[in-house]
Amino acid sequence: MLGDNVIPADSYGGPDQRRIIEGTKYNKKKLVKRCHEGKAWVVGLLPGMKSKHTNGFQGELEKTVMKEENVDFKDFKIEGASELTSLGMHRPLAQKINDLEWKIDEKGFPVFDFWLHKGTYATSLLREIMKSEDVTVY
């Protein structure tokens, strides 16, 4: 938790992307409590042109990966196509699946019903459920 970035819940109970809190020795106990209560989430960097690396060990990992992949924050600015430019943000590393229900339809296919907070990808969840070796089936 020390050095991790955490975002608190917004007024709807989902992750508040506008408030990034760095875990320190002073707030660690409270942040751990809030994360266990589902009122805060540890987040990872989704890089963009206005991003800054996280402090501490996490930031060193970010720098290492970006260097190995030959990626820089400025690479996320797309000249002449501003709609493709990414400013950067943080996303929860784990998220609760809400109201998950499933059934098998009349053709024998599974049907899932659930909802996720804003910024969480249903395709990622379904990929984890399907666990196919063939990435083209998603």
Model-predicted regions and their roles:
Residues 1-138:
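Non-catalytic, substrate/partner-engaging modules appended to enzymatic cores
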